[in-house]
Amino acid sequence: DDIKIYLLNLFKAATAEQFCAIYLSKNERILFKEVYTDNDKNGVSVDMIPFSRSFSNVKPYAVVIAHNHPSGNPAPSVRDDTATEKLAMLFSLNNVRLYDHLIVGATDVFSYRMDGRLDKIIRSANLRFAGL
């Protein structure tokens, strides 16, 4: 619940989508936080190269990713699912655990982990790797 309150406050004034990465140690302490935006009201894209550099330098055990939906509706889109899968693959290649993907709306936060979607996406990403 603390992270939900933090994220609701972080994104409450945002008029465009923003993406936040919270890097965690093995004992779930925050090592580093980073916020990305490209000032697009319809979505946010994360450039994988600087993002990869950041978590390569920090060397987290796990990462929580979060972004806002300025519309106020935290329901995930197909685009959100696709981005989650790409990030899950990137983290897996680097032995980093994707702890959760949170989507922040006006008053509520959607959790991929709590909804069960995260496990499905990670399994799907792992199956794709197995086929390479």
Q: Where on the chain are the PLM-derived regions?
A:
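Long amphipathic N-terminal alpha/beta scaffold segment
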Residues: D1-F32, Y36
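Active-site-proximal loop/helix of nucleotide/amide-processing enzymes and allied scaffolds
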Residues: D2-I5, N27, T37, K41-L132
